[in-house]
Amino acid sequence: MKIFKQLFSAVFLPLSLFAQEPSEATSEETYSEPISTFSSTRVINGHSVETLSKGTYEFRIEHRFGDIAGVNGGVQQMFGFDNLSDMRIAMEYGITDQLMVGFGRSKGTGAPYRSLVDGFVKYKVIGQEPKKSPISITAVAGSSFTYMTAAPDEGLVTHFPKAVHRLNYFAQIHVAHHFGDRGALQVSPTLVHRNYVASTDVNDLFALGISGRIRLTSRFALVGEYYHCFNGSQFRQTGFTNSGALALEWFTFGHNFTINLTNSGGIGETQFIPYTSEQWQKGQFRLGFTVGRKFVIE
């Protein structure tokens, strides 16, 4: 926990100080209202600081293929296109301009879970505005529940002696700053709690996410994110790794389309943060895409 606080301070404090100086290339007229730091409520795998506006629905489809290379990839698997690591379908809704909720269903990777339903609540505490706030701050909390058939082996985390063991939780604070009209940076202190883990693992896992966005044109942007896990046991250090992703984002009014490259097979904070085991250097990374469609029902 001490290491987590120290690293958060090292990243967050310089960002806050720098954020107090507006870009010389940005006029006050440009930022006459709250600034949108990202174009979507997600960066790639993880949440962004953004929320849906009041009365807006968003239908989302997230898809992750199999390994491009390595022992499970290559030409025989059409570089991962023959396989499906995970897929999520979700509906999200903006209750107010600051508060939104979402619900989804994921296939699951099977490492360790399959057949998951999830939900979250997200609230924007403050938005970046000129002369008011140099940063945006958003809080999000959620949970996932697996309804897969319990494993008969009592030594597996999918044995589920009790129904509550099927639940996992996460909580995050997202802090972001928009630099001029091209760049954005976000830090995301994260806590993931799992009700049932291996005897050599830990229930509570702290992580720090760092995300960035560079706008290329009025329609395209490059985005990236990395989640570093802390307080891991020896079990976690040998069996799991950190999640990273890069993506090309294409956005239009009402639509957001992202083509991504990531080493994480699972979708959702309770999956990709604690259970990413694939390694970039072994070719265990995959293509994926996310499609979001916003609409209003009157």
Task: Describe the residue ranges of each PLM region.
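Sec-dependent signal peptide recognition
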Residues: 2-10
